[in-house]
From Swiss-Prot:
Taxonomy of the source species: Bacteria, Bacillati, Mycoplasmatota, Mycoplasmoidales, Mycoplasmoidaceae
Record-level GO cellular component terms: membrane
Protein location: Membrane
Transmembrane segments: 10-30
Protein origin, superkingdom: Bacteria
The protein, known as: Uncharacterized protein MG123
Keyword Membrane attached: yes
Presence of keyword Transmembrane: yes
Organism encoding this protein: Mycoplasma genitalium (strain ATCC 33530 / DSM 19775 / NCTC 10195 / G37)
Mode of membrane association: Single-pass membrane protein
């Protein structure tokens, strides 16, 4: 019994000794591992901040190369801006001597009457046969459709509407349209306008859409005439065609009367009837009773080109261009104004580009620089009541168009009067779609003028004009 107890004690003591020895070994191993880990970490951190001479030189070379590249980039930018500034300043001072001499050769007295009398005489000699009339009408329509058929959406702020509307009683429309709306369908085919219906309570609203004011006006008037005939005439294709012809003849006669009024206001006499009628048709294309003098001159120019080309008439085109581009001043105020400002206008440039466009029968939708200038001077007259014409200074601002590229400027003219700069600017209507964009445009242009031409923005007044939008 005693022997067994002694053996157990020995075993327990041996187990405790072995366990302690094992724990000592494990602890020593852990200490070694921790120490080695700290040693590696310290060495790693030391390596991060300690570089040899070769590494330092390499880093410096890399940084220097980066800075040199950046410096070269900005230096190129600075040089580019300086070149642009120098070019702009030189361009703004350029005066085309060729154009100047051409303008100085122009004499304005009686040229309008001379060319129109010449045109009238040639037409009388030819007796204006029907092929000529048809050709003139075709050219006129083609020309004006290019001007007016600009797809301007309807807006309540001075945009021209592209449609006309009318309302009729539903019963009256059904009588006109006939069974299965055969008359209505035929009318839509021959009226040269898009026609749509909208049913109301007891009425029908008809919308006539076309980018040509003349075509939608013809469709509207013809439709109203047909409705007025339903109680006395059975509507059919023949009646529809006759009514359309009737409306066209009425418009033609009204156009002739409007043309007579216009040429009388411009003191033009003995003008051929066909030209007078074509001039009066402006009312139905532009929706106004008053024809712009520039449009009159352009129309006459196109007719002269047509007659010279098609019918071998020897008309003086150079004389016409002079009269067309410079004879508007009588419309501004009176002959006294015309005489005083004549000297100033002779100093302006007559653009070869404008003349080329007229010769090609591809006049822009917007007024040329002289028409716009005259409208601008008229605005100044309204603002100042009276103007001392000796103080008017016309600036060479044509080069400004190429440099102010944030908006698509059609043209720009500048006049200095009483230390104030007046800019008459033509822009495309699609470029400025709202009053907010107009405000932005004005701010940008004034800033541009202040920086590039060193003009005080407070002394700049801006007039924005287009054919569609006038602000």
């Amino acid at each position: 019994m005693l022997l067994n107890l002694n053996n157990n004690s020995v075993l327990i003591v041996a187990f405790v000794i072995v366990s302690l020895f094992f724990l000592i070994i494990v602890g020593f191993a852990l200490n070694l591992a921790i120490a080695f880990s700290l040693h590696l970490k310290q060495n790693k951190n030391n390596k991060k901040y300690i570089l040899n001479d070769q590494q330092i030189q390499l880093r410096l070379t890399e940084k220097q190369a980066q800075l040199t590249t950046l410096l070269n980039f900005y230096q190129q930018k600075i040089e580019s801006v300086n070149r642009e500034k120098s070019w702009l300043e030189s361009q703004l001072q350029v005066i085309d001597k060729k154009d100047l001499k051409q303008a100085q050769k122009l004499t304005l007295h009686l040229k309008k009457d001379q060319i129109l009398a010449q045109l009238n005489e040639k037409l009388i000699q030819k007796k204006v046969d029907q092929p000529l009339v048809n050709e003139l009408q075709k050219t006129k329509l083609s020309y004006l459709e290019r001007l007016v058929d600009q797809k301007i959406k309807l807006s309540e702020n001075n945009f021209k509407s592209a449609f006309l509307k009318t309302k009729v009683k539903e019963t009256a429309f059904n009588i006109f349209a006939a069974k299965n709306k055969v008359n209505w369908e035929y009318f839509k085919q021959v009226c040269d306008a898009d026609c749509t219906l909208k049913n109301l309570e007891d009425e029908v609203e008809i919308t006539f859409s076309n980018w040509s004011y003349l075509r939608r006006m013809q469709a509207l008037l013809a439709f109203e005439k047909l409705i007025s005939k339903i109680k006395t005439v059975k509507i059919n294709e023949l009646v529809i065609n006759e009514t359309l012809d009737e409306v066209k003849n009425e418009i033609s006669q009204t156009a002739f009367q409007a043309g007579e009024k216009i040429v009388k206001e411009f003191q033009i006499t003995n003008l051929n009837e066909q030209i007078t009628r074509l001039i009066g048709l402006q009312k139905y294309y532009f929706g106004t009773d008053q024809l712009n003098l520039l449009e009159l001159a352009v129309l006459t120019t196109k007719l002269v080109i047509l007659l010279n080309k098609k019918f071998k008439l020897d008309l003086d085109l150079e004389l016409l261009k002079a009269a067309s581009l410079f004879n508007y001043l009588k419309w501004v105020d009176n002959n006294q104004f015309f005489q005083i400002l004549n000297t100033k206008l002779n100093q302006l440039l007559i653009s070869d580009q404008v003349i080329a466009i007229i010769q090609q029968q591809e006049l822009s939708f917007y007024p040329d620089q002289y028409g716009m200038l005259i409208n601008g001077v008229k605005t100044m007259i309204r603002e100042h009541n009276t103007i001392d014409f000796e103080k008017l200074v016309f600036l060479n601002s044509t080069k400004l168009i190429d440099n102010f590229y944030l908006y698509d400027l059609n043209m720009i003219h500048a006049v200095e009067y009483n230390n104030c700069f007046y800019y008459f600017v033509s822009v495309k209507p699609f470029e400025i779609k709202s009053l907010a964009e107009l405000d932005l445009f004005v701010v940008l242009l004034k800033t541009f003028l202040a920086k590039k031409q060193k003009q005080n923005p407070k002394a700049v007044k801006l007039f924005i004009t287009t054919k569609i939008l006038a602000i």
